[in-house]
Amino acid sequence: MKPYLAQARSWASLLQHYGCIKKQHMRDLFAADPQRFDKFSLIFNGILFDFSKNRITEETLKLLLDLARERELQQGISRMFAGEPINNTENRPVLHVALRNRANRPIMVKGKDVMPQVNVVLERMGKFCDRVHRGQWRGFSGERLTDIVNIGIGGSDLGPAMVTEALQPYAKSGFRVHFVSNIDGTQLAETLKTIRPETALFVISSKTFTTQETLTNAHSARNWFLRAAPDDKAIAKHFIAVSTNRSEVEKFGIDPCNMFEFWDWVGGRYSLWSAIGLSIALYLGMENFEQLLEGAHEMDKHFQETPLKQNIPVIAALVGIWNINFLGAQSHAVLPYDQYLERFPAYLQQLEMESNGKHVTRGGASVNYATGNVIWGAPGTNGQHAFFQLLHQGTPLITADFLASAESHNPLGEHHQILLSNFFAQTEALMKGKDEAEVRAELEEANLAKGEVEALIPHKLFDGNRPSNSFLFSKLTPWTLGALIAFYEHKVFTQGLIWDINSFDQWGVELGKQLATTILPELQGGEEVNSHDSSTNGLINYYKRIRHL
């Protein structure tokens, strides 16, 4: 059994090392070593990962790699790929990697190779998408189905929604895709205003097919549809299920022949590679969905086979642990300089925060070190005019990932070069900052009075020394996106192994759902509620007083 993390020898060495270098500025590290970029950057199949703008030295990296070895990282990676039940609180394997196992090597679960099942579902998806795209699968009116409506929440929504937006340039001509996740009826109502029952194809995505939000939205969508359809039989042409629960799918009224399955060893936030990605394949075409899988598979091989020192997910995870546990960063911004990646930060919020937002070890002991951090972000350059002020001059230490492509899908004049000039400038500014001498020289050059110069200097100082990573790739393609998503998955897994937490359960989402089940019947009628604390009682009772005003 591994020792408690804070008792690990390498952890103590890192603490001592931090004490020695905590006041070093990255400006000086770059000035002292012209080869710093070469030493602290890696390239994977054309994707550049630059981590040189972090407050690390070669000794830091050596000690972090020692930590990874002491925490038996390589063995943990092998256990996941071997199909061992590493999700220990649910006694399940974690095999999203099997879903994109393009080499088709056997992956065993309880003595049975899962790959034949995976391949059958992929083949069914391909045939179904082909029929829809060719117009062979038509609606009750005989019209082609052109509006794909994905109804799901969490992993059944965030991944497919992010991927379809990111890869819009690859969309099938004549098709639109819509996503409904929120129980707030507004989202479904506004979506239904934009489509026609005759051309709508609803994909109901729910692992259990009992998720309250998804089933409520699905029933409302069905009721809307049946008001236009000739009879219940029309449902068979317009409603598809993606689930593990055949009986609940049948109970809803969907023909099991129209159900695409996946398995309990696929976690929700890791499920876009499965039949949950059906809306992706319908919108982009199966060939592009398979390219997404190919990119992820290549990153899987890199993660599994590459020595730790050249292993991009491992290095990113270790640098993240350094920033979180030693520098004290509690917030991490994801900043894609690509409008198509607008949903990428929201996708990573679930991936990282639901995976590693844990307060006990795998063995149930309380941790006394930080695990995970707050993930957020927005596309550049929008963020520069909104929250970058805090990144540059605020008191919290906020680390960041910058992502950009060298080539735009929409080359308009100098737009892309201007975009990338900002991408490069922001990472340099966060690292370098601007000291008093530079500020003073600028102000004096502007011919300001001496008193005005002195008054403005503190406001125009940039401390710099703010850590960031940069990802630069040729073009945002299905393959590239697949590799990037898999990179983040493996980074999260690596950090979970180091912290000795289970990155694959999510018990933290349960309590609120349980309480909501209790509260829902209390919202009926006009009786005053007094079964909760005074704040919750007060909120419920005020709602009941004003709801019909």
Curated annotation (Swiss-Prot):
It is found in: Cytoplasm. Gene3D superfamilies: 1.10.1390.10, Glucose-6-phosphate isomerase like protein, domain 1. Its EC number is 5.3.1.9. PROSITE patterns: P_GLUCOSE_ISOMERASE_1, P_GLUCOSE_ISOMERASE_2, P_GLUCOSE_ISOMERASE_3. The keyword Nucleotide-binding does not apply. Keywords: Cytoplasm, Gluconeogenesis, Glycolysis, Isomerase. The active site is at residues 354, 385, 513. Catalyzes the reversible isomerization of glucose-6-phosphate to fructose-6-phosphate. HAMAP family: G6P_isomerase. This is Glucose-6-phosphate isomerase. It comes from Nitrosococcus oceani (strain ATCC 19707 / BCRC 17464 / JCM 30415 / NCIMB 11848 / C-107).
